[in-house]
Amino acid sequence: MSKIRVYKLAKELGKSSKELVNILNDLGVEVSSHMSTVEDETAELVKGMLQEEDKPEEKISKKEPDKKDRKKTKGKKQMTRTATQKEGTEHGQKDTDRREMRVTVNPPLSVKELAEKADIPVNRIIKTLIGLGVMATVNHQIDEEIVKKLIDKMNLKIKISQGEDKEEKPDKVQTDIKDKPEDLELRPPIVTVMGHVDHGKTTLLDVIRETRVAESEAGGITQHIGAYQAVVQNKKITFIDTPGHEAFTAMRARGARLTDIAILVVAADDGVMPQTVEAINHAKAADIPIIVAINKVDKSNAQPDMVKQQLTEHGLVPEDWGGDTICVPISALKKKNIDELLEMVLLVAEMEELKANPDRPAEGVIVESQLDKGRGPVATVLVKNGTLKVGDPILAGYTHGKVRAMINDQGKRIKEALPSTPVEVLGFSDVPAAGDYVQVLEDEKEARAIAEERLQKKQERDLQHDGRISLDGLYQQIKEGGVKELNLIIKGDVHGSIEALRESLVKLSTDEVTVNIIHTGVGAINETDVNLASASNAIIIGFNVRPDSNARKLAEREKVEIKTYRVIYKIIEDLKDAMAGMLEPELKEEVTGRAEVRATFKVPNVGTVAGLYVKEGFINRNNKVRLLRDGVVVYEGDIASLKRFKNDVREVKEGYECGLGIEGYNDIKEGDQIETYTYREIKRTL
């Protein structure tokens, strides 16, 4: 017998999927979501019943008893709960003692650690997580939001730490405003498009912007502010058009959600790639629904079934394969099935029941920020709740201000922004950080006082010993009981090396500390890796790869340790020594200069000479040299020659050009990166 999906039946009946799920459950038909199926016979019965209910005479007589029944049921549930509570208290002091003995946890933490704290088997937690749609292993890191769900679902006798150590970054200011259910209204969903480089994220966003924004705003000029709104079936969808934006991870570090839905773009000819896995991990960690857009299906070598198979290996089972992950085959270039994809976004949003209260002071998130020469500090704010108005006193992280002007994604000045609306805001005292909470307070004086107090506390914290984990201080932190889990992110040049390294490092776990690999990937160390390390208090291990310029700067700012190696056993040795507290004084590598190869020349009897432009530091004739191609180390050796014009020189500084030859190596190509370095002897302290 054929079947029909709930959302399709809801469409035919002119009802929302949520309403139909409730109706079917009331009738005793077991369905869990809009993707569940019902038999045609059941569908016909439901159609007939609803048509009968729609008759004017019977409408009142049928609906009234339903309400009473619901009230009775609610009453019964409340009575049962009260009775249970009474029974519990009659058992004397036992329950009170249990409540008092609640163990405190400080997310993010591993499944194994949570099981130990809660004193329950690990497999019970894993089973419950699967029920919540989270595919996790023993060493999988779970954030605060998921821990809360587990506490509610499993009635765990644990509580989440609210201590000072948790308040590393400024959070929301607590207010007395409570949102009443009757004040809440449906708001547009906020969507992030994620995926691997060159899989079509930008093309998809451009197509949606061109077609849907142009339709809604005739003659409107689209302005790039980091987010925009599209109109589909007279409903708005907010897109964050900076894929893989650091705000996504910055918000996850505080256990909050920036987006409601993630569209994962996977190329049908390429399949699941390292950044695809990275995106899946981020979306799962943030606990948001994923819609997969299988792009480039118009290509002759497209293999959508291969993509679906690969997705199942990462816990995303397509709905046509019996799972609950929506997969839509599209071609962003040829604008094929874009409307169907957007319909699925609206469908998931409907099931999520996204609501906000527009009649309250606004709260939101900084998506992008910059210092504009003419306008001063400018930030794109995504309003999450309330309505942001011109003249509102605002607080965001360590900055404050007053909304002087607001510009929407069409480049028009507006006076107020409703929930889920992205706006460019002028009036901050300083440039806020991406991912900071934005709040409207009573007056500007209060906002200034809180911002100054936060800044002072941050400066005091920075002066104290930094709590970030490093190999040098690892043994001392283990001894003091400060470390129970060593989180690592591994980046390498090839998959085989990464897997070999992963297996070797996990075996180093001891009774005092568990080695937990939270993410692996092929390619150069980037900002996303540093953000993830910052959020998870992890060390980044690079094998035959180096961090890019932005990642290095971010790591310095976030105090994330990046260790790079050429030999696997050296990584294992260092970790063993760090964990055993036997770190010997070592030679520390110091990068002295970075340059770009802009041309190459073949010189008889000499070999290939690279024409360089020095971008950072200086190139010294006596330093070691490293050649990088696409972030991967290709060769390391000595400098054979260094010239300015025709003269041999000892040193060339930043901003100058020079010619450089590498001892015993000629395969230099235009676009390669050159790093020069020296070794400095440093004494390790614990």
Swiss-Prot record:
Residues 295-298 are annotated as: G4. Residues 50-68, 87-99 have a biased composition (Basic and acidic residues). PROSITE patterns: G_TR_2 (PS51722), IF2 (PS01176). Residues 331-333 are annotated as: G5. Keywords: Cytoplasm, GTP-binding, Initiation factor, Nucleotide-binding, Protein biosynthesis. It is found in: Cytoplasm. CDD domains: IF2_eIF5B, IF2_mtIF2_II, mtIF2_IVc. GO terms for cellular component: cytosol. Belongs to the TRAFAC class translation factor GTPase superfamily. Classic translation factor GTPase family. IF-2 subfamily. This is Translation initiation factor IF-2.
